[in-house]
């Protein structure tokens, strides 16, 4: 058991704790800072990012207002690099109390807060998204501050003055005696304990301050108030927006990095870690955003979270609760050797620390004044205010040090490697998120998380099991913050993330027990084995949708002699397909057999199984037996061979991973799978790759590459590589866009065009043209006008919730947008998804879709076919979880075949 000693032990690594450590260290005291998690994982990392001017508190809490405006100026001076000078606007809309404005102005003046009246026109010129219904607008000196950057900046400054930081160390015992304090700290990662002997303890544990005081035998009543916030996926504003009214729910909108954060609520809770969010809070915050920015609630909500405010209970005992509790702070000396600082704001953390350390120095008889407000933090950080575009500017005009790993937040591989080097042991991906904002953008880690896991594994020499477990933990945590917002585009994002992590990576099978095989009954239409008609000459068929189901329906209709017109808003899910076709229980359906025959005829080689990107063991073997070599490229971000090989090896499949350099230097940090596939179409390029790989071969019997081996003629590329290397080669999926999926899309679309079909992608069908109970055509929006195309039969293959065939909103409404067909779904939106993204049972939302009769005709609201000649295929059909059932493509193939058969009749 290690034993440490110091003058001051600071407990709590939030804003107040790190400022206290810095202050005490500057005064010449020996300091240890202990935090039970990572820095700023409590209240300081779960707030809206506002650097307060104090104007919000001017009327109700003038003491806090004065503290905020003074500390606002000090932080700008000593740590400008963690602050974005957004400025602030206080705005009033109709319904806000008019009598509050003069009281607020008077209170701001008394607190020393500059509040400048501007016209509504000027406010909207500065922030065009604001409502034209504004009635008042005032400028104030608000700003945006990054709580994670603040914690790291002050911690590094404290360490420069000799402080020691112990993260993931929880205080489990605290004994305050006449000669000092003895504390027991437990490392939450290793279980090891440390004994710390200190002359004094500063309890800056925020919501946990009462628990820490209780360890020493002292009562401290802290009132916990939970506040919920939502991050929207874009910067609606570049200025902090406050409602000009008494503080209440949802009256602050803060531009933070690439997003906007609206908050907060104020709910009394019973635990310091109660970060739950209730549905009404989401609705209330969106409604309040709509009041100041029209269209706000229709935008994509990205993530919701809550933080717990530690309010000093002395106020609550007098019957004052919630927002009425003052937002200033208290410094409490329980006994010689133990001081607690509680309450306050992140904006006033430096001042809180100053007063706490003043109390310590007074108790120790030390004369050393606070100097933290006198000069900037030490270090080589910029001496200027943070600018949002600084990362992009560095990428565009500086030297690009390696690939861009997180496109949303512009995080490079070099930045991740630098952050990793600062840790004594391998960091969690969530640590890197707090350091770099990794995974905090619109994709919520869908693409960058596995890249970061691969980088951590390689940099720290982690085994594959540990790296994979870290990835799973990060994915689960990202989903937890997005689950309450799963509707619209955000729902589609998490469905995409789920497809990536289940199918392309195989993460669910590596980190959980295999799902039980479910013998689900086939729908009536799937059991019918009648063939498609071969005599539909001249019949006009419109297929809506260009995914697997839509294109295969078009193929079958063309082969039957129909005149086919494919209309689609986009290219469907084919570019997400990992490189194989899951046919599951539909393997003996004639639609699947037709597809496989067609693949053979057109040079498309369906492979019999293969590992997922993370090395999930396949159901069947591929490319023979024996050890395999997994090849990746050193400067390419979308495939990590050591991670794949390590996971294969722990499943009993001998494998070794290597990186080779790309033959030519590629300066672009956005080298996509399709661009790399084009490189492999060049014989000289692949010859050089083969030479590099052959030089690294040992006794491996086969070689696996990322699935980028050519776009034009992958069979030739693979054959030549195999000949040049002297081993069979095979492909392993990469992150989207999928090269195998793109190949299949190109081949299908090209074949249809050569057969005379019309393929119109990029135009949305807006409405049907109906005569009686028949659809005689569809209207398409194109170049500012509507065009009608006529048909004898229509096949609806627009996809499900991901593909856009079904739409959803925050109130739990689901609808089919073209024909207004009823949707089979649960009405409780929170029941659409289970708590874990990769739950092996799947999610109820997977089964949502339209109901059909045995002929695949969609049913209307009365339970009968909506139209005589409308048929459906693919993932718009409800009732089956094809992702968990292992029949994603099989379902598309079988339903497309059946829909065409019913639309055209059969021989």
Residue map of PLM features:
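C-terminal catalytic lobe of FAD-dependent flavoproteins
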Residues: 147, 221-228, 234-236, 240, ...
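Helix-loop-beta segment of a Rossmann-like dinucleotide-binding subdomain
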Residues: 85-90, 124-161, 182, 265-272, ...
């Amino acid at each position: 058991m290690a034993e440490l000693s110091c003058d001051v032990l600071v407990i709590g690594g939030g804003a107040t704790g790190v400022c206290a450590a810095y202050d005490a260290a500057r005064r010449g005291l020996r300091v240890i800072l202990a935090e039970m998690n990572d820095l700023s994982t409590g209240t300081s990392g779960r707030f809206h990012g506002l650097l307060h001017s104090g104007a919000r508190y001017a009327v109700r809490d003038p003491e806090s207002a004065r503290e905020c405006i003074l500390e606002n100026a000090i932080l700008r001076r000593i740590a400008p690099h963690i602050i974005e000078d957004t400025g602030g606007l206080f705005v009033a809309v109709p319904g806000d109390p008019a009598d509050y404005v003069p009281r607020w102005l008077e209170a701001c003046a008394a607190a020393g807060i500059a509040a400048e009246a501007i016209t509504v026109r000027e406010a909207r010129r500065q922030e065009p998204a604001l409502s034209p219904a504004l009635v008042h607008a005032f400028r104030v000196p608000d700003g945006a501050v990054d709580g994670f950057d603040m914690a790291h900046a002050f911690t590094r400054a404290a360490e420069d003055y000799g402080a020691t930081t112990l993260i993931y160390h929880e205080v489990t015992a605290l004994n305050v005696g006449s000669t000092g304090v003895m504390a027991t700290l437990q490392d939450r990662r290793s279980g090891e304990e440390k004994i710390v002997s200190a002359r004094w303890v500063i309890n800056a544990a925020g919501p946990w301050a009462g628990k820490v005081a209780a360890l020493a035998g002292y009562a401290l009543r802290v009132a916990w108030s939970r506040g919920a916030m939502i991050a929207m996926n874009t910067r609606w504003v570049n200025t902090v927006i406050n409602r000009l009214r008494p503080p209440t729910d949802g009256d602050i909108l803060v531009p933070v990095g690439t997003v906007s954060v609206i908050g907060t609520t104020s709910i009394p809770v019973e635990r310091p870690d109660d970060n739950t969010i209730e549905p009404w809070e989401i609705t209330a915050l969106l409604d309040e955003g709509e009041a100041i920015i029209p269209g706000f609630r229709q935008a994509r909500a990205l993530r919701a979270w809550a933080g717990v405010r530690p309010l000093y209970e002395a106020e609550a005992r007098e019957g004052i609760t919630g927002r009425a509790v003052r937002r200033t702070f208290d410094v409490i000396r329980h006994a010689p050797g133990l001081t607690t600082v509680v309450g306050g704001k992140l904006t006033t953390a430096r001042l809180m620390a100053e007063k706490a350390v003043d109390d310590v120095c007074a108790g120790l008889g030390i004369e050393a004044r606070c100097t933290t407000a006198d000069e900037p933090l030490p270090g080589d950080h910029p001496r200027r205010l943070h600018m949002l575009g600084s990362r992009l500017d560095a990428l565009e005009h500086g030297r690009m040090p390696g690939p861009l790993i997180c496109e949303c937040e512009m995080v490079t591989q070099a930045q991740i490697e630098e952050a990793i080097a600062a840790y004594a042991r391998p960091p969690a991906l969530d640590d890197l998120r707090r350091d770099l904002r990794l995974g905090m953008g619109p994709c919520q880690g869908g693409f960058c998380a596995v890249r970061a896991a691969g980088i951590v594994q390689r940099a720290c020499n982690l085994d594959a099991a540990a790296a994979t477990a870290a990835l799973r933990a990060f994915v689960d945590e990202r989903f937890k913050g997005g689950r309450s917002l799963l509707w619209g585009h955000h729902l589609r994002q998490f469905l995409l993330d789920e497809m990536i992590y289940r199918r392309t990576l195989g993460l669910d099978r590596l980190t959980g027990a295999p799902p039980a095989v479910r013998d689900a009954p086939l729908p009536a239409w799937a059991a019918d084995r009648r063939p498609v008609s071969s005599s539909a000459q001249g019949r006009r068929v419109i297929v809506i949708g260009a995914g697997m189901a839509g294109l295969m329906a078009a193929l079958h209709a063309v082969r039957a002699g129909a005149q086919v017109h494919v209309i689609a808003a986009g290219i469907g899910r084919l570019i997400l397909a990992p490189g194989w076709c899951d046919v599951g229980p539909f393997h003996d359906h004639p639609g699947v057999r037709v597809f496989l025959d067609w693949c053979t005829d057109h040079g498309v080689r369906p492979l019999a199984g293969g590992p997922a990107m993370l090395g999930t063991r396949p159901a069947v073997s591929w490319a023979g037996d024996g050890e395999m070599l997994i090849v990746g490229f050193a400067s390419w971000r979308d495939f990590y061979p050591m991670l794949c090989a390590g996971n294969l090896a722990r499943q009993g499949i001998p494998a070794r991973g290597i990186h080779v350099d790309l033959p030519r230097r590629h300066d672009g940090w956005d080298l996509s799978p399709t661009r790399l596939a084009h490189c492999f179409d060049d014989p000289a390029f692949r010859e050089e790759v083969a030479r590099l790989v052959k030089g690294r071969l040992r006794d491996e019997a086969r070689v696996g590459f990322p699935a980028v081996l050519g776009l034009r003629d992958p069979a030739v590329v693979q054959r030549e590589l195999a000949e040049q290397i002297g081993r069979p080669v095979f492909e392993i999926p990469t992150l989207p866009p999928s090269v195998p999926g793109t190949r299949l899309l190109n081949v299908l679309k090209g074949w249809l065009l050569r057969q005379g079909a019309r393929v119109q992608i990029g135009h949305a069908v807006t409405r049907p043209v109906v005569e009686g109970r028949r659809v005689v055509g569809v209207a398409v929006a194109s170049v500012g006008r509507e065009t009608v195309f006529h048909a004898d039969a229509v096949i609806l293959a627009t996809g499900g919730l991901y593909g856009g065939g079904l739409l959803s909103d925050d109130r739990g409404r689901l609808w089919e947008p073209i024909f207004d067909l009823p949707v089979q779904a649960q009405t409780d939106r929170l029941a659409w998804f289970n708590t874990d993204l990769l739950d092996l049972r799947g999610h109820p939302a997977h089964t949502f879709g339209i109901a059909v009769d045995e002929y695949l005709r969609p049913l209307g609201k009365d339970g009968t076919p909506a139209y005589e000649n409308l048929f459906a295929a693919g993932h718009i059909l409800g009732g089956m979880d094809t992702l968990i059932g292992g029949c994603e493509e099989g379902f598309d193939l079988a339903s497309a075949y059946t829909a065409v058969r019913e639309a055209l009749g059969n021989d």
